[in-house]
Amino acid sequence: MKNSSAPPVGQQRMVQPVLGLMPQTQPNDVTCVQTCLAMALGVPVAQVVARYGDKALNQIALWHAIQECGIVANAFVYPPPVCRGWHFIAAPSLNMSGSEHQLLMHYEPDDGSQGITILDPAGEGKNVYQRDGSNLKSWHSLIWFNPGGSLDWPNGMDEGRRTQDSANTTGHL
């Protein structure tokens, strides 16, 4: 289904958080991974693109970025969601035949229907996965995550923590 959520002429659309994450739109056709990472971190996608570039990223690059940014995460071998909460998932692209598309999925089995909520970063006028997941038929590369982390991690840690960590690593055995 086409993303037809453009505001009427002369009006700005107010974006509301979805289960604690602020939806964002990818700046080009291949930055869905960067945009999902930005939503997980709670930063503008431009900051993630400045760090990781505006070219397509694969699942290995996503996993490295998750670790670099200090996001608490766990990759799963099999695709069925088993943990409540947010997941990075890869699904068939609805806009580029034969390509993959990165999405965020929230899983809460007690929330009726399929128990999932989808954040699709595809841009205006693009085919998108529905928020309720009704048109999502398959996915893979499931990575559960706890929103947070920082583009500056571990440099973004407070001074007391750095001092404590330094003391722990420089002690005698």
Q: Which residues make up each language-model segment?
A:
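Active-site nucleophile-adjacent alpha helix/oxyanion-hole segment immediately C-terminal to the catalytic cysteine
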Residues: 1-69, 161-164, 169-173
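Conserved active-site-adjacent core of cysteine acyl-enzyme catalytic domains
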Residues: 43-143
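Cys-His-centered catalytic/binding microenvironment captured across papain-like cysteine peptidases
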Residues: 2-10, 25-27, 31, 108-173
